[in-house]
């Protein structure tokens, strides 16, 4: 092996392909004719190389290279030209490919495809292939439309001609491929074709480096074209000499399948040269794409055809057929699999070459075939199968698609004929061999292919007809069209394909579609280049290749024509196809050789008139109907119109209007688009014969003017106008090249045969935007619409006037309100429209654009919706449809009969006419439904009309839609027709139902109006109807309900009944609708009920509806029903209820019947009402104590709902019946008006309430019980739990007991009996059953009773039972005084609980006076229910008397009595609720007795009887009693509970000595926490006395009357100590207090001891009150223990106990000192006389100063004196500085706040200056020691947390006023502030208040500089020492300063202040 040469330039780029040609390949090349053999070998080598995919660097031995170069040297110049073209193509910017996602991706995947360009045949071949690939990979620049690069004049060479289109740089690659496949052998063509596909795939896969385009090759002069085909080199060994810098690489030109130019090669070559020149200029120009690319010079073509045409021309048609005039078509006999169209024209020279090289070529083709097959498989697996083909396609020049390879779809292998998607190319080939659609279209394609496409206007003249015409053979087996080109073929007809083409092959081979323009596109060999690629890709997706290729190539050509670059608009070519024109208007129609050569390498894209000489108008509509074609069209249109590179290109599915970003996405969408598939199915099922499509005028690229909607509308309008879908004449918009596709060409592709699915909705958005939309029919407008501006669009105006009918449909279409695809069916039917229809549609479309999505337009109201689902939803509610529904039926027949009279025989024409019937229906707006579904499949007009009509009816209830469908049905598929029929049937049914409903509604409304005069119409409650109205009266019941509702409302004014509701159970007692006594468990279907009547109705009077019951109680307002309620119920039971039970409105007929029955029942009911009204009047007369408002309420009820009154006034017997009868099953459900109301009202009422009256009736009749209806409790039957409302009970039962509604109704919950009275206890259920069994009364429901009910059910201590009798008597007396009306009830309540129950039971059973007589009206109920204490209603409090609670508290004190009555009252109610009735009564009696005693001796009564009742020393500590007396005497105003104090003194907390302060604080806190103003003054006692008399007023009076005293209240230590000294200092505390207890003011006789004793628990074990508040800091604690523990460390308490408390103690010394202090305190207790004097002073003192003076009089040793003094001083300072609206929360609760709170007044002490949270409730753990850091304090704590809190809050050193002033020189420290001011402050104080400052001081010694002002810091210190109160003005500054210097105590104070005052946004303050 000689030296290995590395490839450079293009060869280097081909390296990725690993194109190492084996020696044998080189030898083969040697054996072959330089051109043909070389091209073949090169192709084969390239394929083989691609297949080999050798990774080794592409290196060939020198010998190999030499051989190859020698062989290719002869044609080197031509190869250079080819290479140049290729390189130019390769160098073409990839940008143009952007639009083509597939191309772009492929180019990215195969960037190196361009590397294959090598000089020589190999180079030419490989370059052609590679350039082809490159084209695919890197689409040409915008100037390079679809590979229409301007090639150098040398491009006319065969290599250039075949290797690459003269107009495309891919031509080189095509030449390569062509030459490769240009073998003489037919097999060679087959193999070559396949190999090209596969090579293209492989090469595309392998060539991943377009980045390195081969160095531009010198453009060879066109003169070289005359030479034989230059050898196409698949491998380029050496880099070609760089092209002249001044010479620009030829711009890429459209790569079309090899077009065989006939013998007139010179002329054709000239044309090619001209085209090339024009292309160059176009390349230089911005819009080179618009300029037709010159085909290879005719001379080159001729030479190619004459010379070894097989070599170069034989280049597989798969590669874009070079401009060579002749392509040799291998005999069709060749296996289709290997069949590759011969690329060499059947020239003698080519044949000779073929003969010489036949063996080699065959062998090479075999290799190539294998390679290509393998590559194709690999590509298919990798999704690149399509890409290489497009590359090849782009590479090849205008070679006509000789043998369309199975079009590998871009990722989708779709049959071009039937649009069937296949998994891979092989399957596609197989499918296409047997594809009926393809076979059907094959003849047409053959004819089309035989005809040469019209040359572009600018293209050089097509080769003269003398040029050998190519015979086009389509091999089904391979799916490739093998076209043998005869130079004799005419320039236009057979310039590319000879009319002598074997139509058998084409017809038999579904792949002929390629020749139609699709196959070659699919065939990268046939159609290469970016444009070709995109087109091919689309064509692949555009299963119908013939048309899409034409469209796409036409687009490519139309790039010359000014159409957007297909690369820029990937679907642009599709647009042409989508448009009826399918770019039929493309230069093909021009029939100019240049255009033909340049613009339409793939003849199909030639003018619509000629598809390779085929008159598309002559083409059967089946092609257009072919879904594949449509797809391809749409795809082609979209790609051609928008170009892949055009990002703006919008690809819109014409079927569903969905826009996608790329062709590939659009294709994928087609796979899933149901509408599209429907149309495809329609087209596939009945593919109407191809009709001529009108030439597509220049398609306005992406013009939205002709939107899809307009296309659809236009199609519909055209159909409506019944304009035959005759292909419009090539009224083509002049493309920039003055190209006008022939209508022939357009029609077949535009949708002649295929309903322009692609055009109508397959075409891209741009297509839709373009005229494509107008052209598209409703569903299937021909792709023409999407093509370049359709001439149809221009023609549309003419067409429209032709058949413009004023049909609503047409108007809607014009308005674009009608969407052709109003229904999926409409789409399908529209798809049926022929191309002519499409054309018509297009014309119409232009005139009418759809503003929205015309597909989804309501045919009734013309409203456009965004989706079919919305449209359907809209139809359901369309008012117009409803109004027109009746008319629609009439209009439907016209629409149905309306059939396209002018419908052409072709299905498309029929489809187009099908819309016309839609115009006929204009009779009804529904007929104008825009949903004209045109099915591609042709349906006989009659059948279609029938289907359409039925379908329209099914699809749209609206006649218009039906009409549309009927008309469109002619084109509808059977499925569409069936769907339309079904839809129509559904619509008819809906309309009928609606009509019936309307009729029923009218009737009902009429009935209601008639009844409205009497009763507001209301749907009878089935149960209510049964119960309330006899079955015969069921309808009447409805009216009654309606009539009763107004009546019921007045009746139920107390609980205004909710407005009558519809529904069975919906009617609640509030509506007076008696909840039928029939339990739901028993509820039956309407029939059963009607037959059986109500179950329990007879047993109980029915609700107001149960007029018979009311009739018993004559209701004047209801005179219609005379039957008594019971009788009425019996009637219900005996009578079958009509189906009325269901709301009559539910069933119109039933409703009518019900209304009738209601009317009758109402008449009867009125009679009963009259009777009931009378009864009710009588009952009302019996109502004695009924409140006036209730009387009015009942009167109103009488007037409005006699039934209610009747029930209200029903006899007790009725009540008994109700009690006996189970509540209505609805009772448990209906809770709107709780039975509690009825219970309250009716419990006291006679039976009618208890009878099956509705809750409303019962309520109205019954006097409101003392408790409100909302307060009525109910008992769960299962667990006997009481709930506040029936609803809650029901919920409970359903949730907990898992009961069903029926079960609940069967066993409804019963109201909890009111313990207050028998009536209340009876608590009739809120059911028809009336009062529940008295057992419920027995049940203690008082748990939820109000305080007013407490007397009967209040909780009383067992001890109180002994006194129960006396208390009951007292209560009875007071009740009689308070409520004479309640005398009976009160007596009953006063009786033992069983007795009231019995009474209740009796009340339930025996007829009782009306509830009003028995029960007081709700206003007095608070009084009545409570123990009747006359003045304050303390009857309620007595039951609830907090004294009773205080009895339970550890330290009974005035706190309980002084506590606001509100607080006191709730306690007793709770106790009464949860206690036995005996206890309640006992408590009530006690309360009454206490009241009397309080009146007699308020102080002692309160203290002994209520507060402590210390008569029993065992129950109460004598200390507490003594202290209380002292308080009464004013001696111990400031002393807390002595017991607590003593307790604190006796026991220490945390091992600390318990000073009196601590004990006192604990005591105080206990008292306060218990809520006892333990230190209340006598005034406070008097306040309590007042409270007892006026509990509601006392809370205010007490604090107001004794604010001073309250302020003084908290000096417990002082008062206590003084008192102890006065009493017996040496004596034990207990003894000391015992004596005072004996001393009681004679003026105050003690209250009855039994009461106190029974009502009180021993105070020795006080129960922690709800408020466990620290007396010092007011912090609320959770338990007494917590409180005591808190007191031990509470700074306030400590201060109160020890004035020097803050001093840091020396632990032991401190303890000892504490003990000593305690002893001193005890010893220094003032003597009794001092105490007396002190008490006198306290009585006189009105301010804190007086208290301080009194304290000062005490001996100095007394800590209490100091504390009091300090506290008073603090109070004064707080008064001065407190500017806040509320007491500074953070401060140590200045005592000034205490007076405001009566509760806290007793608990608050002068020492408690901080609020609970302020005083350090929140600890801080910044202290690690448990000792107070101040030795003076001497405190130690059990935890660091407590110590920190102590340091912050409790330490005297920190809280002492002026403590920050140094006490000694050693204690001073100089503070220097930012204002240079200097202050001396106590070091100890600073260290105490701030750990941070302490740290600083430790570091800095005696000086400390602070970055703040002295004023600010002083404020901080003053706040800390309580000199200054925190206010809203200073809070901000204080907060900042405290945080800055870490004064935790101040920080907490500030936080507390903010929290208490809700101070969220502190005001601005002085900045530090």
From Swiss-Prot:
- GO MF terms, alphabetically ordered: DNA binding; double-stranded RNA binding; single-stranded RNA binding; transcription coactivator activity; zinc ion binding
Tissue expression per record: Expressed in seam cells, intestine cells, pharyngeal muscles and nerve ring neurons.
Compositional bias of type Acidic residues: which residue ranges? 812-824
The compartments listed are: Nucleus; Cytoplasm
Q: Where do the zinc-finger regions (C2H2-type) map?
A: 413-440, 651-672, 856-875, 1274-1297, 1668-1694, 1826-1858
Q: State where composition is biased (Polar residues).
A: 346-362, 472-482, 1201-1211, 1251-1273, 1624-1633
Tell me the Gene Ontology biological-process terms attached to this UniProt entry.
cell differentiation; determination of adult lifespan; negative regulation of gene expression; positive regulation of transcription by RNA polymerase II; regulation of development, heterochronic; regulation of translation; response to heat; sex differentiation
> Keyword Zinc: yes or no?
yes
Q: Where is this region: Disordered?
A: 72-252, 271-364, 451-499, 538-601, 681-712, 785-854, 882-905, 975-1069, 1083-1227, 1246-1273, 1333-1478, 1569-1608, 1624-1671, 1769-1822
Phenotype of gene-disrupted mutants: RNAi mediated knockdown at early larval stages and in young adults results in an extended lifespan. RNAi-mediated knockdown results in delayed developmental defects with an increased number of seam cells in young adults. RNAi-mediated knockdown suppresses the embryonic lethality of hermaphrodites in the double fox-1 y303 and sex-1 y263 mutant background.
Major localization listed first in the record, in broad terms: nucleus
For this UniProt record, the keywords arranged alphabetically read as follows: Cytoplasm, Differentiation, DNA-binding, Metal-binding, Nucleus, Repeat, RNA-binding, Sexual differentiation, Transcription, Transcription regulation, Translation regulation, Zinc, Zinc-finger
Q: What is the recorded phenotype of mutating residue 1398 to D?
A: In bp283; extended lifespan, and a slow accumulation of dcap-1-positive P-bodies compared to wild-type, indicative of a slower ageing rate. Delays the L2 to L3 larval stage switch
Locate the compositionally biased regions of type Basic residues. 107-119, 690-702
**Gene Ontology terms, cellular component aspect?**
cytoplasm; mediator complex; nucleus
Q: Where is the composition biased (Basic and acidic residues)?
A: 570-594, 1388-1403
What Pfam families does this protein map onto? zf-C2H2
Alphabetized InterPro entries for the sequence: ZnF_C2H2-type_TF, Znf_C2H2_sf, Znf_C2H2_type
UniProt feature, compositional bias: Low complexity: 72-88, 120-134, 144-165, 219-232, 298-338, 483-498, 794-804, 827-851, 981-1015, 1023-1046, 1108-1131, 1147-1185, 1589-1608, 1800-1811
Where is this chain compositionally biased, Pro residues type? 452-467, 1136-1146, 1407-1421, 1429-1445
Stored PROSITE patterns: ZINC_FINGER_C2H2_1, ZINC_FINGER_C2H2_2, ZINC_PROTEASE
Quote the function comment for this protein: RNA-binding protein, which regulates the expression of proteins required to control developmental timing of events during the L2 to L3 larval stage switch. Binds to the 3'UTR of the transcript of the heterochronic protein lin-28 to post-transcriptionally negatively regulate its expression in certain tissue types in the later larval stages. During larval development, controls the timing of seam cell division and terminal differentiation into adult alae. In vitro, it can also bind to DNA through its first zinc finger.
| Description of its domains | The Zinc finger domains 1 and 5 bind single-stranded and double-stranded RNAs. The Zinc finger domain 1 binds DNA in vitro.
Q: What is this protein called?
A: Signal element on autosome protein 2
Biological source species: Caenorhabditis elegans
Q: What is the lineage of its organism?
A: Eukaryota, Metazoa, Ecdysozoa, Nematoda, Chromadorea
């Amino acid at each position: 092996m000689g030296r290995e040469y590395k490839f450079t330039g293009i060869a280097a780029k081909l390296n990725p392909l690993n194109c190492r040609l084996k020696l044998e390949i080189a030898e083969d090349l040697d054996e072959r004719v330089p051109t043909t053999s070389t091209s073949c070998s090169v192709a084969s080598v390239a394929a083989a190389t691609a297949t080999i995919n050798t990774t080794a660097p592409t290196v060939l031995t020198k010998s190999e290279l030499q051989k190859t170069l020698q062989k290719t040297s002869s044609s080197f110049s031509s190869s250079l030209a080819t290479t140049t073209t290729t390189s130019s193509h390769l160098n073409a910017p990839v940008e143009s490919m952007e639009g083509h996602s597939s191309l772009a991706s492929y180019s990215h995947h195969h960037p190196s495809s361009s590397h294959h360009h090598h000089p020589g045949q190999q180079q030419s071949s490989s370059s052609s292939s590679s350039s082809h690939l490159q084209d695919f990979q890197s689409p040409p620049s915008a100037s390079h439309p679809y590979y229409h690069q301007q090639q150098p004049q040398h491009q006319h060479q065969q290599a250039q001609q075949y290797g690459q289109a003269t107009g495309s740089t891919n031509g080189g690659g095509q030449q390569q491929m062509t030459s490769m496949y240009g073998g003489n052998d037919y097999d060679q063509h087959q193999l070559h074709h396949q190999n090209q596909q596969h090579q293209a795939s492989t090469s595309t896969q392998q060539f991943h480096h377009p980045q390195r385009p081969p160095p531009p090759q010198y453009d060879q002069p066109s003169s070289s074209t005359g030479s034989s085909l230059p050898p196409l080199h698949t491998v380029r060994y050496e880099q070609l000499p760089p092209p002249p810098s001044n010479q620009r690489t030829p711009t890429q030109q459209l790569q079309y399948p090899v077009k065989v130019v006939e013998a007139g090669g010179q002329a054709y070559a000239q044309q090619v040269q001209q085209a090339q020149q024009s292309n160059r200029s176009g390349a230089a120009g911005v819009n080179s794409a618009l300029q037709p690319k010159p085909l290879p010079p005719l001379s080159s073509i001729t030479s190619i055809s004459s010379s070894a045409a097989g070599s170069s021309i034989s280049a597989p048609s798969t590669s874009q057929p070079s401009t060579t005039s002749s392509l040799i078509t291998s005999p069709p006999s060749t296996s289709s699999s290997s069949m590759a169209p011969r690329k060499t024209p059947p020239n003698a020279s080519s044949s000779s070459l073929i003969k010489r090289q036949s063996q080699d070529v065959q062998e090479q083709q075999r290799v190539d075939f294998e390679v290509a097959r393998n590559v194709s498989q690999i590509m298919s697996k990798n999704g690149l199968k399509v890409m290489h083909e497009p590359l090849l396609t782009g590479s090849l020049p205008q070679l006509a698609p000789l043998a369309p390879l199975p079009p590998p779809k871009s990722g989708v292998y779709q049959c071009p004929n039937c649009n069937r998607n296949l998994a891979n190319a092989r399957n596609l080939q197989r499918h296409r061999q047997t594809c009926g659609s393809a076979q059907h279209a094959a003849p047409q394609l053959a004819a089309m292919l035989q005809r040469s496409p019209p040359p572009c206007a600018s293209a050089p003249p097509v080769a003269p007809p003398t040029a050998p015409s190519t015979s086009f053979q389509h091999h089904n087996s391979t799916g490739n069209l093998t076209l043998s080109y005869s130079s004799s073929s005419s320039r236009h007809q057979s310039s590319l394909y000879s009319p002598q083409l074997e139509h058998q092959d084409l017809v038999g081979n579904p792949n002929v579609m390629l020749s139609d323009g699709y196959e070659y596109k699919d065939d990268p060999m046939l159609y290469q280049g970016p444009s070709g690629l995109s087109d091919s890709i689309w064509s692949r997706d555009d299963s119908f290749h013939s048309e899409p290729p034409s469209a796409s190539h036409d687009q490519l050509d139309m790039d010359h024509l000014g159409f957007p670059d297909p690369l820029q608009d990937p679907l642009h070519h599709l647009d042409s196809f989508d448009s009826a024109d399918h770019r039929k208007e493309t230069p093909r129609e021009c029939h100019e050789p240049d255009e033909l050569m340049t613009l339409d390498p793939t003849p199909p894209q030639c003018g619509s008139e000629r598809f390779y000489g085929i008159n598309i108008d002559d083409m059967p509509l089946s092609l257009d109907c072919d879904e594949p074609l449509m797809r391809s069209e749409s795809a082609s249109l979209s790609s051609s119109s928008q170009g892949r590179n055009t990002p703006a290109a919008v690809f819109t599915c014409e079927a569903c209007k969905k826009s996608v970003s790329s062709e590939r996405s659009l294709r994928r969408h087609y796979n899933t688009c149901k509408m599209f598939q429907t149309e495809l199915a329609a087209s596939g099922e009945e593919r109407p014969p191809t009709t001529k499509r009108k030439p597509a005028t220049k398609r306005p690229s992406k013009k939205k003017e002709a939107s899809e909607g307009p296309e659809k509308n236009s199609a519909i309008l055209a159909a409506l106008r019944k304009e035959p879908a005759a292909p419009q004449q090539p009224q083509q918009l002049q493309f920039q090249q003055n190209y006008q596709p022939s209508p022939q060409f357009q029609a077949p592709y535009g949708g002649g045969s295929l309903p322009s699915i692609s055009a109508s909705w397959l075409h891209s958005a741009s297509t839709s935007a373009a005229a494509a939309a107008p052209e598209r029919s409703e569903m299937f407008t021909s792709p023409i619409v999407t093509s370049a501006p359709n001439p149809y669009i221009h023609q549309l105006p003419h067409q429209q006037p032709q058949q413009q009918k004023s049909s609503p449909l047409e108007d809607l279409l014009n308005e674009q309100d009608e969407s052709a695809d109003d229904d999926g069916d409409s789409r399908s039917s529209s798809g049926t429209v022929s191309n002519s229809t499409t054309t018509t549609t297009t014309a119409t479309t232009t005139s009418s654009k759809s503003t929205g999505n015309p597909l989804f337009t309501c045919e009734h109201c013309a409203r456009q919706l965004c989706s079919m689902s919305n449209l359907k939803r809209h139809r359901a509610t369309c008012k117009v449809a409803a109004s027109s529904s009746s008319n629609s039926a009439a209009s439907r027949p016209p629409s149905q009969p309306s059939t396209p009279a002018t419908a052409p025989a072709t299905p498309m024409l029929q489809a187009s006419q099908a819309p016309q019937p839609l115009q006929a229906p204009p009779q009804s707006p529904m007929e104008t439904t825009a949903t004209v579904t045109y099915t591609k499949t042709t349906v006989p007009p009659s059948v279609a009309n029938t289907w359409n009509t039925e379908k329209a009816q099914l699809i749209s209830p609206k006649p218009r839609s039906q009409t549309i469908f009927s008309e469109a049905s002619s084109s509808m598929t059977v499925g569409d027709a069936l769907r339309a029929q079904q839809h129509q049937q559904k619509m008819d049914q809906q309309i009928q139902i609606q009509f019936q409903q309307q009729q029923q509604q009218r009737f009902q409304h009429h009935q209601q109006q008639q009844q409205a005069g009497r009763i507001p119409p209301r749907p009878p409650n089935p149960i209510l109807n049964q119960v309330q109205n006899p079955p015969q009266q069921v309808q009447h019941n409805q009216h009654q309900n309606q009539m009763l509702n107004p009546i019921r409302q007045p009746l139920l004014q107390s609980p205004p009944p909710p407005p009558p509701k519809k529904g069975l159970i919906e009617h609640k007692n509030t509506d007076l609708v008696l909840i039928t006594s029939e339990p739901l468990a028993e509820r039956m279907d309407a029939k059963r009920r009607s037959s059986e009547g109500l179950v329990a109705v007879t047993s109980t009077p029915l609700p107001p509806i149960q007029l018979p019951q009311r009739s018993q109680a004559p209701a004047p307002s209801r005179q219609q029903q005379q039957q008594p309620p019971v009788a009425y119920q019996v009637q219900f039971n005996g009578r079958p209820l009509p189906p009325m039970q269901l709301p009559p409105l539910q069933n119109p007929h039933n409703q009518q019947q019900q209304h009738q029955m209601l009317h009758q029942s109402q008449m009867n009911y009125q009679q009963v009402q009259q009777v009931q009204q009378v009864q009710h009047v009588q009952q009302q007369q019996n109502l004695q104590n009924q409140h006036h408002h209730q009387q009015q309420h009942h009167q109103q009820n009488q007037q409005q709902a006699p039934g209610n009154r009747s029930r209200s006034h029903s006899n007790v017997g009725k009540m008994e019946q109700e009690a006996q009868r189970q509540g209505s099953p609805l009772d448990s459900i209906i809770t709107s008006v709780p039975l509690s109301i009825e219970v309250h009202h009716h419990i006291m009422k006679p039976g009618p309430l208890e009878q099956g009256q509705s809750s409303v009736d019962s309520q109205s009749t019954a006097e409101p019980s003392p408790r409100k209806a909302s307060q009525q409790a109910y008992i769960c039957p299962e667990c006997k739990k009481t709930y506040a409302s029936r609803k809650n009970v029901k919920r409970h039962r359903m949730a907990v007991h898992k009961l069903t509604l029926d079960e609940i109704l069967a066993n409804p919950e019963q109201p909890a009996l009111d313990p207050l009275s028998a009536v209340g206890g009876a608590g009739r259920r809120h059911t028809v059953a009336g009062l529940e069994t008295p057992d419920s009364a027995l049940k203690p429901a008082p748990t939820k009773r109000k305080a007013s009910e407490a007397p009967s059910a209040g909780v009383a201590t067992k001890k109180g039972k002994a006194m129960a009798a006396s208390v009951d008597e007292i209560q009875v007396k007071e009740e009689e005084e308070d409520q004479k009306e309640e005398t009976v009830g009160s007596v009953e309540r006063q009786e033992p609980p069983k007795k009231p129950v019995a009474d209740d039971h009796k009340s339930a059973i025996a007829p009782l006076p009306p509830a009003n007589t028995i029960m007081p009206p709700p206003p007095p109920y608070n009084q009545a229910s409570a123990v009747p204490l006359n003045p304050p209603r303390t009857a309620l409090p007595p039951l609830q008397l907090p004294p009773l609670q205080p009895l339970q508290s550890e330290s009974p004190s005035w706190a309980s009595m002084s506590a606001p009555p509100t607080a006191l009252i709730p306690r007793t109610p709770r106790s009464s609720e949860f206690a036995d009735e005996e206890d309640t009564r006992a408590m009530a009696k006690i309360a009454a007795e206490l009241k009397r005693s309080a009146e007699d001796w308020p102080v002692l009564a309160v203290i002994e009887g209520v507060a402590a009742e210390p008569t029993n020393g065992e129950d109460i500590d004598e200390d507490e009693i003594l202290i209380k007396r002292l308080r009464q005497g004013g001696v111990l105003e400031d002393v807390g509970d002595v017991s607590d104090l003593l307790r604190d003194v006796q026991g220490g907390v945390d091992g600390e000595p318990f000073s009196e302060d601590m004990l006192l604080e604990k005591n105080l806190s206990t008292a306060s926490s218990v809520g006892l103003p333990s230190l209340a003054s006598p005034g406070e006692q008097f306040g309590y006395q007042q409270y007892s008399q006026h509990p509601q007023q006392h809370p205010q009076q007490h604090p107001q009357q004794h604010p001073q005293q309250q302020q003084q209240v908290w000096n417990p230590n002082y008062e206590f100590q003084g008192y102890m000294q006065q009493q017996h200092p040496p004596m034990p505390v207990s003894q000391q207090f015992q004596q005072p207890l004996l001393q009681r003011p004679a003026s105050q006789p003690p209250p009855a001891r039994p009461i106190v004793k029974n009502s009180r628990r021993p105070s020795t074990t006080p129960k922690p009150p709800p408020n466990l508040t620290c007396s010092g800091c007011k912090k609320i604690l959770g338990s007494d223990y917590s409180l005591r523990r808190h007191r031990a460390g509470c700074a306030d308490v400590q201060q109160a106990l020890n004035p020097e408390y803050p001093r840091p103690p020396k632990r032991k010394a401190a303890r000892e000192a504490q003990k000593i202090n305690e002893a001193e305190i005890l010893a220094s207790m003032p003597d009794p006389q001092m105490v007396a004097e002190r008490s006198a002073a306290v009585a006189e003192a009105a301010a804190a100063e007086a208290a301080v003076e009194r304290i000062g009089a005490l001996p100095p040793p007394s800590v209490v004196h100091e504390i009091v003094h300090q506290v008073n001083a603090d109070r004064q300072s707080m008064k001065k500085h407190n500017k806040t609206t509320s007491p500074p929360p953070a401060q140590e609760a200045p005592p000034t706040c205490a007076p405001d709170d009566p509760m806290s007044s007793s608990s608050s002490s002068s020492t408690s200056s901080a609020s609970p949270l302020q005083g350090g409730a929140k600890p801080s753990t910044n202290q690690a020691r448990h000792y107070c850091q101040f030795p003076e304090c001497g405190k130690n704590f059990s935890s660091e947390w407590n110590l920190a809190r102590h340091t912050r809050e409790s330490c005297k050193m920190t809280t002492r006023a002026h403590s920050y002033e140094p006490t000694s020189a050693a204690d001073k420290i100089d503070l220097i502030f930012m204002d240079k001011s200097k202050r001396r402050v106590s070091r100890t104080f600073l260290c105490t208040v701030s750990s941070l400052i302490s740290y600083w001081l430790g570091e800095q010694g005696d000086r400390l500089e602070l970055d703040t002002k002295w004023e600010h810091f002083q404020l901080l210190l003053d706040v800390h020492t309580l000199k200054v109160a925190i206010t809203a003005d200073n809070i901000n500054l204080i907060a900042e300063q405290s945080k800055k210097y870490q004064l935790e105590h101040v920080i907490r104070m500030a936080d507390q202040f903010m929290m208490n005052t809700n101070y969220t946004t502190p005001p601005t303050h002085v900045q530090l």
